[in-house]
Amino acid sequence: MRKLTLLLGLLLTLGSLHAQEKGQFVLQAEANAGVLFHDLLKDNRKVHPEVALGAVFGYQFSDHLSLGVGANVRQTSDVVTWLPVFASAKYRFNDSKVRPFVEARCGYAFCLLGLGYKGSSKGNSYVSSALCEGFYAAVAGGCSFGRTDLGLGVQFINIHTHEMGWNIAGEPFQYESQDIKPAVFLHYAYNFYFGK
């Protein structure tokens, strides 16, 4: 299956080496893989692998600039799943076959599946949850090869941690924290152009 996927990706890349034209709509299908830096489980693991699949629908205003809106589903190895919805701006720097680009995104991430766990410490029992929800931003840079984009990026996601429990005397307690944490990712996208 991996070989078939790699072969299909290679054929799509090689079969579409032509420059984008202004005045077209673009649908960008993408896949990302990276790591999120946060201690989600209080288990001293600060690095959590994540994968993402998504799409951006936009308009190519010039040979260099496209603007759009998009969403992707992101999941960490700890099964925290979230859906960032964002506005996107992409700028390609020249008109050659290999075109450097930079892309910026800003939006809101909705939690689809949080991470919950139970525990006890020093006579206290507690239930905790970690949600990736709130502010979302990302910046990526790389090169476009025809319709294919390859790059490296960094994203910032709002991590909301909520903990509640009961102390040894049976009294309830609650703790909440909110942090914006970074992640780095490898970016692969294939662009479909239409409307002209």
Predicted regions and their residues:
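Flexible, surface-exposed loop regions and adjacent strand-edge segments
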Residues: 48, 85-86, 118-124, 165-173
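Bacterial Sec-dependent N-terminal signal peptides
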Residues: 1-25, 192-196
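Extracellular loop and loop/strand-boundary signature of outer-membrane beta-barrel proteins
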Residues: 39-43, 73-75, 120-129, 170-178
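Outer-membrane beta-barrel proteins, especially TonB-dependent receptors
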Residues: 161-187
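Gram-negative (and chloroplast) outer-membrane scaffold detector with strong preference
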Residues: 24, 33-35, 56-122, 129-147, ...
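N-terminal targeting signals for Sec/Tat export/insertion, comprising classic cleavable signal peptides
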Residues: 28-56
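C-terminal beta-signal and adjacent terminal beta-strands/loops
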Residues: 152, 156-163
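Short sequence motifs at beta-strands and strand-loop junctions characteristic
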Residues: 21, 45-49, 79-81, 129-135, ...
